[in-house]
C-alpha cells in the first residue's frame, strides 16, 4: 500500500527545519549505503548521528505520534531516526530497494524495514525534477508533494529519485517496523479501519459498527507481533 499523508508538519515547523538544515554541514550520501546502492546514489545527507539531524528528527516523530491517519496505515512498532537528504545540480538516486534490516544508531536494537517514509521539506515549484518514482505490480508511481506532506510505501518497492535540474529537493526519510509485517494484511486492516470510521460518523456506535470494530481488533490481535 502506498499512501499520501498530508500536513504532517505545519508551515511553521517546515520553515524552522529548513532554516536549520540550510545552515547544516552535508556529506556525500554514498557514505550511508552499501556497495550496490553507492553505484546509483548521488546526493548529500546529514550524518546519521548529526546532533542537528537527531533534534529535527524528534520534531517529525512527535508530529507523527499525533497523526491518526499515519498510525492507522503504518501500525508502527519501531522507528529508525529520521534522516535528511538534499539533491541539486543533477543529483539523483537510481532504482534500488532499501535494505531489509537496519541497526538503530546509538542502540543495540535492529528493525525490519517494513515501510519507507519520505517527508517533503520544499514546495514542488521550488525545484525541477526530483520526483520519487515507486514501482510496484501496477506500474510506476510518480510522487512530488507539498512541503510538510509525506508518502508512505512498502520498503520492498523498487524506487528511485529523478535528477534535480533546478533548485534543491530537501526531504526527510526514514524506515519503520510495523506491528503487522505483511503488507496485504496491513492494507486490509487500514481499509477496514477507515470504513469503520466513516460508518461510525454516519451511524454512531450502533451494534453493527461495534461488531465491525471487534472484528478489526481481533484481526489485529491475530496478526500483530509486539
UniProtKB/Swiss-Prot annotation:
Domain of life of the source: Bacteria
Regions crossing the membrane: none
Entry's Gene Ontology BP terms: DNA damage response; intracellular iron ion homeostasis
Cofactor note text: Binds 1 Fe(2+) ion per subunit.
SMART domains assigned: P4Hc
Cofactor(s) needed by this chain: Fe(2+); L-ascorbate
GO molecular function: 2-oxoglutarate-dependent dioxygenase activity; iron ion binding; L-ascorbic acid binding
Protein keywords: Dioxygenase, Iron, Metal-binding, Oxidoreductase, Vitamin C
Record-listed 2-oxoglutarate binding positions: 169
UniProt-listed InterPro entries: Oxoglu/Fe-dep_dioxygenase_dom, PKHD_C, PKHD_hydroxylase, Pro_4_hyd_alph, Pro_4_hyd_alph_FE2OG_OXY
Residue ranges annotated for the Fe2OG dioxygenase domain, each copy included: 78-178
Protein name, UniProt field: PKHD-type hydroxylase mma_3620
PROSITE patterns: FE2OG_OXY
Binding residues for Fe cation: 96, 98, 159
UniProt-listed Enzyme Commission number(s): 1.14.11.-
Organism: Janthinobacterium sp. (strain Marseille) (Minibacterium massiliensis)
Amino acid at each position: 500500500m502506498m499512501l499520501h499523508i498530508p500536513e504532517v508538519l505545519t508551515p511553521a515547523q517546515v520553515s524552522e527545519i529548513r532554516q536549520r538544515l540550510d545552515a547544516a554541514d552535508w556529506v556525500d550520501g554514498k557514505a550511508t549505503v552499501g556497495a550496490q546502492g553507492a553505484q546509483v546514489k548521488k546526493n548529500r545527507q546529514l550524518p546519521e548521528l548529526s546532533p542537528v539531524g537527531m533534534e529535527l528528527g524528534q520534531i517529525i516523530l512527535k508530529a507523527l505520534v499525533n497523526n491518526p491517519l499515519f498510525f492507522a496505515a503504518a501500525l508502527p512498532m519501531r522507528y529508525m531516526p529520521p534522516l535528511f537528504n538534499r539533491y541539486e545540480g543533477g543529483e539523483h538516486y537510481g532504482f534500488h530497494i532499501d535494505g531489509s534490516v537496519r541497526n538503530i544508531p546509538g542502540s543495540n536494537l535492529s528493525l525490519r524495514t517494513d515501510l519507507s517514509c519520505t517527508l517533503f521539506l520544499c514546495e514542488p515549484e521550488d525545484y525541477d525534477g526530483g520526483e520519487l518514482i515507486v514501482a510496484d505490480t501496477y506500474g510506476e508511481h510518480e510522487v512530488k508533494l507539498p512541503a510538510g506532506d509525506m508518502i508512505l510505501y512498502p520498503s520492498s518497492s523498487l524506487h528511485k529519485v529523478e535528477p534535480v535540474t533546478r533548485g534543491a529537493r530537501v526531504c526527510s526519510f526514514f524506515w519503520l517496523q510495523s506491528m503487522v509485517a505483511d503488507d496485504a494484511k496491513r492494507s486490509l486492516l487500514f481499509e477496514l479501519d477507515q470504513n469503520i470510521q466513516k460508518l461510525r460518523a454516519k451511524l454512531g456506535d450502533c451494534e453493527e459498527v461495534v461488531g465491525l470494530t471487534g472484528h478489526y481488533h481481533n484481526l489485529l490481535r491475530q496478526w500483530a507481533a509486539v
